[in-house]
Amino acid sequence: MRLCLLGFIACLLTPALVLAESTPRLTPAQLRELERQARILYEQTQEFLRQQEKSGKKVRKARRVEPKPTSCNLPSPKRAAQFSQELLPGIPLADRYALYVGACGLGDVVKLTQQLVRFQTVNGEEPPAKNPAVVAMGRFLQQWAKTRGFGFRVAGRKDVFELSWGEGPPFLGLVFHGDVAPVAAEEWKYKPFEPTVVNGRLYGRGVMDDKGPLATALISLSMAQEMGLAPQRGKVLVIIGNDEESSWLGMQEYARTEQLPTHIISVDSGYPVVVAQSGVVALNLEAMLGTVDSAGAAMLLPVDASAGESLNQIPAAASLSLAPFAGKSIDQGLAAAKAAVEATRKERSGLKAEVKVVSAPGSGSRIVISTQGKAAQASSPEEGRNALWDLAAIADKLPLADNGLTAMLQMVTRRFDGDHQGERLGFTEKDPFMGSMTAALTLLRVKNGKATLAINMRRPRSSEGNEDFHQALDHAIALINQESDGRVVEGPGRFVSDPHVTDLKSPLVATLIDIYQRHRSIRGELEPISIRGNTYARLFPRGVDFGPGIQELGPYTGHKADEFISLDHLGLNTQMLAEAIHTLALSSNAP
């Protein structure tokens, strides 16, 4: 029986067959089969040696070398050298690069993801360029790029980070965002900005959306460079926006003013490849709290309310502050509030609500009703539980004074509660490929005597143009205004974007589908998909999304409490993106 004398990696690839220099690229399945056969052969060899020794026969040990496991802890040049042509004769460079990423990439990706997650890049009212966490992350990325010989610059509105590799015009752009969704800390078991690995999962805000994917790209490029690969058709860019969870102004500026790559891949959605995104609609409703002329049967006056943390996220928490009204005592109001909560609990399964009395300096005591829901992206409202719906349902059972905030909550119950698709507003848009419309309430605030409610909608393509859609919005607003006796009106900030649809049959799409299909061992034909989500890819004419979500490996957890990605999932994402980068930019046969 032949003994393996070539070291561990060579042992896995060469004992079962002799590979010629002309060997074509191996598929992931072929690589796995070679590894399986080699492991069996190695185990048989060891058993043969043990039996020989037991029988007392002499075993010739001259020049016998024990296989050594790959060491991923070596300095980069020595680590990459384990996958050299000398140690793996006959294996094409593309496959040796894939083996290198498969063996050592995951550890590097986890480490870099953890470093990125520690920057608490939640955007507030200040622009990203003035957010200390965003600025600090930019400095970190600049140093990371410098030590590896990559270019780095700041673009957009001084809030887009661009890492570059190679010469010539940009050919491949990998697009990510470095800002993350807000965190409701009380909902988390693990600390959101102290990433940790537990039971094969990496936890932390941004590990799925979108710092984990960013790390897969950076490590894939770094390891390609270590293997002696280089861009063949032009520059490879890693483009990192930092306002994806808010305004998009920085990346819009970048897409409008910069020379754009031939191929654009965002990694902020799912597989096999996303070629279409619903249009985004932002709408604001307002109501002045005003004064109340007569009390009637009212016992409580709404004075403040709050729901949500982000314009594109379903509220996980909501609260309503009430003052005793028309001579009623705090105890009477408290009893009424508790009764309303209990009555609502009987009607709404899983309701999480509490009532408490708090002290309001200068204003006496206040009764506060709080509800807890489940956060989800506004593009997938059905995956969450809107805490504002629950709060409005409770308010509907309270003897409230009739002011603007009361009117706003009544409107929520009448036109939104239980309806994710905007049907109660009169919308019926559906598309066979892109699906149905959605309408989600995301942010409620009271400031300077005025209640403001943000609505986030997603619309599929249709035969009707933007003008027709604006008319439908006008009709919905008129209905709301009429039902509230003129108290709820549209505020400033209406925004309507077109759906984004790129070429479903482009070489880029075909390449990415082929990569996904081979790595997932999927038989049959795969088709590109559409999402209601909203990624930076829509800003680029040929932009598509490739990952990171794989439903079979776990739910998409971006924007949710205890956001996580399994290590198996993260490793697979890294291997697929690495192959995409090689095929599209590092090979002379790039499409």
What is the role of each PLM region?
Residues 1-4:
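Positively charged n-region of N-terminal signal peptides that target proteins for export
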Residues 18-20:
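Boundary at the C-terminal end of the N-terminal hydrophobic targeting segment
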Residues 171-240, 246, 258-259, 560-561, ...:
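Active-site metal-coordination/substrate-binding segment of hydrolases
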Residues 210-292, 331, 335-338, 419-438:
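Acidic/histidine-rich catalytic neighborhood of metal-dependent amide-processing enzymes
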Residues 285, 295-297, 316-318, 325, ...:
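A short core secondary-structure module
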Residues 368, 372-454, 458-475, 480-591:
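An extended, acidic, His-containing surface patch that forms the Zn2+-binding/catalytic region
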